[in-house]
Amino acid sequence: MQAPPPEHCPGVESEDAGKGSACSGCPNQGVCSDPNKKLEDPGKALVVESMKDVKHKLLILSGKGGVGKSTVTSLLARYLARSNPDSNFGVLDIDICGPSQPRLMGALGESVHQSGYGWSPVGIEDNVCLMSIGFLLGSVDDAIIWRGPKKNGMIRQFLSEVDWGNLDLLLLDTPPGTSDEHLSVVSYLKDDTNSESLRAVMVTTPQEVSLLDVRKEINFCKKQNIPIVGVIENMSSFRCGHCGNTSEIFPAKTGGAPAMCAEMGIPLLGSLPLDQQISKACDSGEDLTEFKNVTTEALEGICSKIMASFS
């Protein structure tokens, strides 16, 4: 068993692994400095064992912050669960420094419990469960100031020490960019015996500043051989609740997600509106999908395409 990494550990993938000043005196120094040994991560075998009953995994990615990845993740999970009552769904919040799912899913103040099989995720509905570092903090205002190795260790624990049980689909809410969290979760799930079930969905807003980073995320998935189910354009338009007119709050100067999808050969799953009801539901944690509205109409088509991609 490897000892916990020191506070300023450069990480096993770094050129300084086992050689940096922080490595002096670390019991893992010999493992990290040996190019053969450092590739052997005992945590990977634990992840494979823990995830053996999780049929499919779906990464919710963007590259850009503020486009609504977490909101879209919660909406997808709840709509999928409501429209597939005989299936089981899980949500894993791997945005370690900015966990949003406890609030979005109406689970603020909940805590996880240890069982003989590991951490028990928090039940949201009969067929939806959630795990987030937000459940492990003393206060919602606590800041998490961690370097890469500690984040990676936390993600490994979420994948190997949470009792997910039998899930038809696990949705993973990710932070912006292609950082430690992304590399860590992909490295573990691609080593899963059912790695073919790992796919990704991109979330973007219509403006080019968002699309620029989504293109990078698409290329990240291509380099990692992760199939992309498609792209969701969030906040695509706004319909006034008084006059009923529709306007573009974020104009698509370069054609928005449809043009990017055509350019890169990626399916467009659909568009979600900028909806005041979504904003209110995010703050209160209530389930918006139990009501018929413009958002749930859009979710119906998006979710059917996602489920079809795994069949």
From Swiss-Prot:
<feature type="binding site">
    <location>
        <position position="240"/>
    </location>
    <ligand>
        <name>[4Fe-4S] cluster 2</name>
    </ligand>
</feature>
<dbReference type="InterPro" id="IPR019591">
    <property type="entry name" value="Mrp/NBP35_ATP-bd"/>
</dbReference>
<keyword id="KW-0479">Metal-binding</keyword>
<dbReference type="GO" id="GO:0140663">
    <property type="term" value="F:ATP-dependent FeS chaperone activity"/>
</dbReference>
<dbReference type="InterPro" id="IPR028601">
    <property type="entry name" value="NUBP1/Nbp35"/>
</dbReference>
<dbReference type="GO" id="GO:0051539">
    <property type="term" value="F:4 iron, 4 sulfur cluster binding"/>
</dbReference>
<keyword id="KW-0004">4Fe-4S</keyword>
<comment type="subunit">
    <text>Heterotetramer of 2 Nubp1 and 2 Nubp2 chains.</text>
</comment>
<dbReference type="InterPro" id="IPR027417">
    <property type="entry name" value="P-loop_NTPase"/>
</dbReference>
<dbReference type="GO" id="GO:0016226">
    <property type="term" value="P:iron-sulfur cluster assembly"/>
</dbReference>
<dbReference type="GO" id="GO:0046872">
    <property type="term" value="F:metal ion binding"/>
</dbReference>
<dbReference type="Pfam" id="PF10609">
    <property type="entry name" value="ParA"/>
</dbReference>
<feature type="binding site">
    <location>
        <begin position="63"/>
        <end position="70"/>
    </location>
    <ligand>
        <name>ATP</name>
    </ligand>
</feature>
<feature type="binding site">
    <location>
        <position position="9"/>
    </location>
    <ligand>
        <name>[4Fe-4S] cluster 1</name>
    </ligand>
</feature>
<dbReference type="InterPro" id="IPR033756">
    <property type="entry name" value="YlxH/NBP35"/>
</dbReference>
<dbReference type="GO" id="GO:0016887">
    <property type="term" value="F:ATP hydrolysis activity"/>
</dbReference>
<comment type="function">
    <text>Component of the cytosolic iron-sulfur (Fe/S) protein assembly (CIA) machinery. Required for maturation of extramitochondrial Fe-S proteins. The Nubp1-Nubp2 heterotetramer forms a Fe-S scaffold complex, mediating the de novo assembly of an Fe-S cluster and its transfer to target apoproteins.</text>
</comment>
<feature type="binding site">
    <location>
        <position position="32"/>
    </location>
    <ligand>
        <name>[4Fe-4S] cluster 1</name>
    </ligand>
</feature>
<keyword id="KW-0408">Iron</keyword>
<dbReference type="GO" id="GO:0051536">
    <property type="term" value="F:iron-sulfur cluster binding"/>
</dbReference>
<keyword id="KW-0547">Nucleotide-binding</keyword>
<keyword id="KW-0411">Iron-sulfur</keyword>
<feature type="binding site">
    <location>
        <position position="243"/>
    </location>
    <ligand>
        <name>[4Fe-4S] cluster 2</name>
    </ligand>
</feature>
<feature type="region of interest" description="Disordered">
    <location>
        <begin position="1"/>
        <end position="21"/>
    </location>
</feature>
<feature type="binding site">
    <location>
        <position position="26"/>
    </location>
    <ligand>
        <name>[4Fe-4S] cluster 1</name>
    </ligand>
</feature>
<keyword id="KW-0067">ATP-binding</keyword>
<comment type="similarity">
    <text>Belongs to the Mrp/NBP35 ATP-binding proteins family. NUBP1/NBP35 subfamily.</text>
</comment>
<feature type="binding site">
    <location>
        <position position="23"/>
    </location>
    <ligand>
        <name>[4Fe-4S] cluster 1</name>
    </ligand>
</feature>
<dbReference type="GO" id="GO:0005524">
    <property type="term" value="F:ATP binding"/>
</dbReference>
<dbReference type="InterPro" id="IPR003593">
    <property type="entry name" value="AAA+_ATPase"/>
</dbReference>
<keyword id="KW-0963">Cytoplasm</keyword>
<protein>
    <recommendedName>
        <fullName>Cytosolic Fe-S cluster assembly factor Nubp1 homolog</fullName>
    </recommendedName>
</protein>
<dbReference type="GO" id="GO:0005829">
    <property type="term" value="C:cytosol"/>
</dbReference>
